[in-house]
């Protein structure tokens, strides 16, 4: 590969770098493929864990990068990407809380910002040609920086397996901690961790205990429930168990609490954007609790038409996020409308955690539309039940006319 005629036209490229096997191989490949090309490594800290960042700069430089930029995006990710998404009620195909999908636009945006800062003329990612992420990243690049060249090595090089990558690095004396026996492909951030590959590729195989990393097995969770209280302001959690916390810190605390009770596991076969189906196991402990809490308060404060509208756009928003269309006018509009509704989502909620379940058992709100005096079956001075007769006649008028016309 190093003896091939080198390409020209790219002098400086910013690579989305994780330190894993793929991106470790991409750095020398870029240097060998493009003539006189400088590689800038970029890593987005979206809450994947401190252990993932230790030694990252040294590893990037040893692989041939001239610089490594690690950008802390944790608070911005939760505040400006997670909360706007869950405000719309978006859940992909009724189950998936979009953990990987939500992280891609902020990573792409930060990558473009680094590219502008260092004067790069190209960006590069390590996504495979079979997955969703290539579309998400490149869709964001197109929206934010259409002038930058996009390099996708997995669609260009001849390597096809982990063994190929390991041999490639060994030939160049580039050290890696990866091995050919890696079982699962994982992607982690503050919201969740995903698991794919290995025995999971056969949907008849039950996930082994070794798959899960954030949550205990529900059957092994404590035999006594735990109650966690959330204070919510404008659709965002501000306090956990009466402790004021930043958006990111609140999510981390809930991840820890809920994970101990086996909350937030799903095992799904989803429809990928590129046309194929894939199986994934996801853990979203804190996010599951947040979602349950916010939905409980919404039940108190949103009227029927508002909730109906929100349910209608939830599916559309889930596809926009999943398909990498974050930086589009429609996505921006749906978020703005949903956050307007969230202005009244204020109050307190108590979530019961028990063996994999997160259930809202107490809720209150200063904006509540629920009235015990209205809802009671007892006598009251507010609602005259006789008024229902006229309403019902008008409400059923079309049905009445249709029936008369068919006689």
Curated annotation (Swiss-Prot):
Binding locations of ATP: 16-24, 44, 126
GO molecular function: argininosuccinate synthase activity; ATP binding
List of residues binding L-citrulline: 96, 101, 132, 136, 185, 194, 270, 282
HAMAP family: Arg_succ_synth_type1
UniProt-recorded name of the protein: Argininosuccinate synthase
Subunit relationships: Homotetramer.
Nucleotide-binding as UniProt keyword: yes
Catalytic activity: L-citrulline + L-aspartate + ATP = 2-(N(omega)-L-arginino)succinate + AMP + diphosphate + H(+)
Record: residues binding L-aspartate: 128, 132-133
Pathway the protein acts in: Amino-acid biosynthesis; L-arginine biosynthesis; L-arginine from L-ornithine and carbamoyl phosphate: step 2/3
Protein's gene: argG
Membrane-spanning residues: none
Family the entry assigns: Belongs to the argininosuccinate synthase family. Type 1 subfamily.
Cellular component annotations (GO), alphabetically ordered: cytoplasm
